[in-house]
């Protein structure tokens, strides 16, 4: 049995197909471009939990190891997920390395593992390992 706490309608819909999953969905404002649930209500809801694994996504990673996004509302939710998780996994595709964005979510040192969609430049792999983050290229 697995309990999934999410701020994503899409993730909830996929997980709900498995009857052994207990799916808990945050309340808040639906962001139409990706069906993410954001806002103060979502943050307060997520803050009620202490989860083993938190999974976040981002819009960019800069050369200092800052994790970046464009939507300040999603950033607040991602920060809350980081605070409430024993281990934090970042899932991002290769295009996000070196991509600028306006709002800082966190730093590489705040996550435990990074999952990406294939080989990345050595400078990025070195930066990731330098901060003690496990790197998985899948």
Describe every region a protein language model picked out.
Residues 9-138:
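Conserved phosphate- and dinucleotide-binding cores of soluble alpha/beta proteins
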């Amino acid at each position: 049995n697995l309990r999934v706490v999410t701020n994503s309608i899409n993730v909830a819909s996929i997980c709900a197909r498995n009857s052994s999953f207990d799916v808990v969905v945050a309340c808040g404002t639906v962001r139409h471009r990706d069906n993410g649930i954001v806002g103060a209500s979502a943050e307060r809801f997520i803050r009620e939990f202490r989860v083993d694994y938190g999974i976040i996504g981002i819009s960019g990673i800069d050369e200092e190891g800052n994790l970046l996004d464009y939507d300040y509302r999603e950033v607040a939710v991602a920060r809350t997920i980081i605070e409430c998780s024993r281990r934090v996994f970042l899932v991002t595709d290769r295009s996000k390395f070196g991509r600028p964005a306006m709002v800082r979510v966190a730093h590489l040192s705040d996550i435990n593992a990074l999952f990406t969609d294939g080989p990345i430049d050595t400078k990025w792999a070195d930066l990731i390992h330098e901060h003690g983050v496990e790197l998985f290229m899948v």
